[in-house]
Amino acid sequence: MMFFWIFWSILMSLSLGVIHGTGTSLLNPEGEKISDPFSWLNKELIYIIGYMMIVRYLFQKIPILNIRSLLLTPLKKSKIIRYAMHQTIFSIFNWIAFFYLIPFSIMLNLDPDTGDFNSSNLLIWNLSIILIVYFTNFLNILLNKKDNLVVIFGVVLTLIKILEYNNLLDISVYSESIFYSLYETPILIIVPLSSLIFIYYYVFNFFFFN
């Protein structure tokens, strides 16, 4: 059953990457195409990452129990913690980002209307998003058993989306500006990279000293 869901997640990610990369709306495939799929995705990324954090919290297996049980063995403490942390790297919640972004970027470049992208900048943008995804991976470990905090986050995110739908608030403008800057100014990849390095060692020290 687990392999079915993994296969389904990969297939859906690939399909959505192709669909969104061509500017087609999944809700209205026969309707008018999205004129600028790249800008559209940058606007929605703040919500996508937020909702994925909630889904990850609900379904991703956290290696805390593995760490605690292994700490009772003669194995070196640092190796145990790194082993458990590195297990999460291969989570399907991380890989679906690859399976979505790769076809999305390919379709962007193939489309004559939207294909005027700097390939190296687009690659850096992809890597930046992947780094952010892995940041949420390790953040999820810290959020273990903090149900109230995650519920509050989910409620706030939903309320913001409702306000945006009713034209009372629009944070997608800021989302587009932030994520587009990762394409426009490639050196900014240092921000998600340094954030990932920081949270990796923060999580490591959290378990090592506690």
Please place each PLM-identified region on the residue numbering:
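Hydrophobic alpha-helical transmembrane segments of membrane proteins
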Residues: 1-67, 77-210
